[in-house]
Amino acid sequence: MSRSATIDRQTQETQINLDLTLDGCGEACIATPVPFMNHMLTLLSRHGFFDLTVKAEGDVEVDDHHTVEDLGICLGQAFVKALGDKQGIRRYGAATVPMDETLASVHIDFSGRSCLVFNMDLPKAKVGSFDVELVEEFFTAFCNHAGANVHVNLVYGRNLHHMIEGVFKAFGRALDEATGLDPRIQGVLSTKGKL
């Protein structure tokens, strides 16, 4: 059984093609008009041990918002499709990652219920040309379209780049844990019998 998905999203604001393979080795080929997101998605794939190919175009002449949000939408949809009925997955994942002076933590539950708890007090600032407030937009879009409960906690940090990078690395590791198959799990990990 191949746990993979292809998502095509075509709107008047963005055109995105995304391929995801859960049981990969962390290979990424990311081409979007938002360089900082290219970096974040590449390390997300690497630290999550899933293969990810993304080709995106967007109305970045307006700003990066639509592209970043739609990347979150597509990634969330891809996880839903790749996980299928969620038979045998661990469901929960958690990771805490240091990134130099930063410590970041992400917890996830593929419960089928969308909820984001985002405890990063980010200033209205930029890393390069990237508006850091778009990090929350990405995670909101992912949660809404993955049916996932995600808690993002920045424990501490000073450098904005390190803070965001630490969160994406922790997110990758948490995704790897939550989507991993466990032979002890018969059906789905829920007393309801369905996720």
From Swiss-Prot:
Keywords: Amino-acid biosynthesis, Cytoplasm, Histidine biosynthesis, Lyase. It catalyses: D-erythro-1-(imidazol-4-yl)glycerol 3-phosphate = 3-(imidazol-4-yl)-2-oxopropyl phosphate + H2O. It is found in: Cytoplasm. GO terms for biological process: L-histidine biosynthetic process. Pfam families: IGPD. GO terms for molecular function: imidazoleglycerol-phosphate dehydratase activity. The keyword Cytoplasm applies. It is an enzyme of class 4 (lyase). CDD domains: IGPD. Signal peptide: none annotated. It comes from the Bacteria. The keyword Cytoplasm applies. GO terms for cellular component: cytoplasm. Pathway: Amino-acid biosynthesis; L-histidine biosynthesis; L-histidine from 5-phospho-alpha-D-ribose 1-diphosphate: step 6/9. Belongs to the imidazoleglycerol-phosphate dehydratase family. This is Imidazoleglycerol-phosphate dehydratase.
